Regions:
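Non-globular, low-confidence helical/coil segments that flank catalytic cores
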Residues: 2-309
Length: 309
């Protein structure tokens, strides 16, 4: 009888432990926390191991941004490109053998960044969409996306500076901009409403600037200083002269500067002075116009960069 009682107690303990595991440990659930930290590297600094290899692909989608982050069968996108270039986006995702996109970050509501978001959400089973919450009233795709998100679909959350989105083991993004106190004057330029995010994967870091322009870059340089240091910089506003001030880039000091842009004749991106300044800092500058899709591979300790051409 005692033996039977002991077995029953073990069984009950096992059931309780299993329930606790399922309730409190959700390895694929993303969480957002208002981060109150003195240093960015407290949760993912040097020596931190990540969960396997992270593959970051800046897809060649012509003029626009569409960046794919893949690890352990889980896919995240930062922007989805222009709706006019949907075929290029889908071809890039097909080459990457993407069947599902779990999460999308919309940096801001310009067509060349968010134009395919709802199409991606519908086709690839997106479960969560983050954005900065500033719609473009003059663009139908933005108006529609804003309506869908503000209605609470796709587990939407508006992000602000200080938020942290955890994506996996020692794998998270820190939101640096827009600040909750962003002025109406600055927000009138949608580029300045861009989500600026610092990605951490183990000790590897990559700074995504969206289309943030000089005014925002100056504020970031003043607020964060040397904490902006990153291995790779996703250059702001396609390498336009409106962005990439030395005050910011000299704090980032990237080994690589990646630019997503279409043919030079279209918008004259990237600006030659911007490219020259980045090279002066020691960065190797790559563009999707010249190099095709650009892929970064990292295990959280070291990284490599490959190009399509």
């Amino acid at each position: 009888m005692r033996k039977l009682k002991f077995i029953c107690q073990l069984l009950i303990a096992f059931i309780i432990a299993s329930l606790g595991y399922n309730i409190f440990y959700e390895p694929h659930q993303e969480t957002v926390r208002a981060a109150v930290r003195q240093q960015f590297n407290q949760a993912g600094g040097a020596g931190q191991e990540a969960g396997g290899q992270l593959k970051i692909t800046m897809l060649d989608v012509g003029h626009g941004d569409a960046i794919l982050l893949s690890t352990a069968g889980r896919n995240v996108m930062i922007d989805t490109g222009d709706s006019r270039n949907l075929a290029q986006l889908e071809a890039g995702l097909a080459r990457a053998q993407v069947k599902r996109v779990h999460t999308v970050f919309v940096t801001h509501h310009h067509e060349d960044h968010m134009g395919n978001t709802l199409k991606v959400a519908g086709k690839y089973g997106v479960s969560r969409i983050y954005d900065s919450g500033y719609p473009n009233a003059r663009a139908a795709n933005s108006v529609r996306l804003n309506q869908v998100l503000r209605a609470g679909n796709y587990n939407n959350r508006v992000l602000r500076a200080g938020d942290t989105v955890y994506l996996g083991k020692n794998y998270y993004v820190e939101v640096l901009s827009p600040d909750a106190s962003l002025s109406r004057e600055l927000a009138a330029n949608l580029n300045n409403t861009s989500l600026v995010m610092l990605l951490h994967y183990g000790s590897f870091t990559m700074l995504f600037m969206g289309d943030a322009e000089k005014e925002i870059e100056g504020l970031l340089a003043e607020k964060y200083g040397a904490r902006l240091k990153a291995d790779i910089l996703k250059v702001g506003h396609h390498g336009s002269r409106t962005s990439s001030i030395y005050r910011l880039t000299s704090r980032v000091k990237p080994a690589y500067a990646l630019i997503s842009c279409g043919p030079f004749e279209l918008y004259h991106h990237p600006n030659k002075n911007v490219v020259g300044s980045l090279r002066h800092l020691g960065a190797r500058v790559l563009t999707t116009a010249d190099n095709g899709s650009i892929t970064v591979l990292t295990d959280g300790k070291s990284f490599s960069v490959e190009t399509e051409r």
